[in-house]
Regions:
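Bacterial N-terminal signal peptides
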Residues: 1-11
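OB-fold and OB-like single-stranded nucleic-acid-recognition modules
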Residues: 13-120
Length: 120
C-alpha cells in the first residue's frame, strides 16, 4: 500500500519526490538546508513555542526504518499518518543543545486527505 502511494505521489507533478526517512538520515550533508518530502506516523507530540514566540509542535515522524524530528505550527495528533514537506537541517544549535536531523515543516498533509484528493 505504501509503495502504491509513493508511486501515485511520484506521478503527480505538483508533489516533489517522497524520500524514505532513512535516506535523509543516511545522507544528511546532501539534504542539509534543502526542502524534503517525507511521510510517516506521528509520535511523541509536544507543544512548544517557536523562535518567533508562536505556539508550535514538535514531534517524531517514523517510517518503517527511521525517525526524524519535525517542528511545525500545524497541529498533529499521536498516530496520524502524514506527508511532511519542509526544510531539513542536519544540525542546529538550540542554546546549549545541538539538535540533529530536524525538519521545519512548511506543509503537513494527512494521508487520508491525500486519498480524498485522488478520489474526488
Amino acid at each position: 500500500m505504501v509503495l502504491g502511494l509513493v508511486s501515485l505521489l511520484l506521478s503527480t507533478p505538483a508533489v516533489a519526490e517522497v524520500l524514505e526517512v532513512t535516506e535523509v538520515i543516511a545522507h544528511p550533508q546532501h539534504y542539509d538546508r534543502k526542502e524534503v518530502v517525507v511521510m510517516g506516523q506521528v509520535s511523541a507530540v509536544q507543544p512548544i513555542t517557536d523562535k518567533q514566540g508562536q505556539p508550535a509542535f514538535q514531534f517524531l515522524l517514523k517510517d518503517t526504518a527511521g525517525t526524524l524530528k519535525v517542528i511545525s505550527r500545524v497541529p498533529v495528533q499521536e498516530g496520524d499518518q502524514v506527508i511532511v514537506e519542509g526544510t531539513f537541517t542536519r544540525r542546529r544549535q538550540g542554546g546549549r543543545l545541538a539538535v540533529y536531523n530536524e525538519v521545519s515543516a512548511i506543509v503537513i498533509r494527512p494521508l487520508n486527505q491525500f486519498f480524498a484528493d485522488l478520489v474526488g
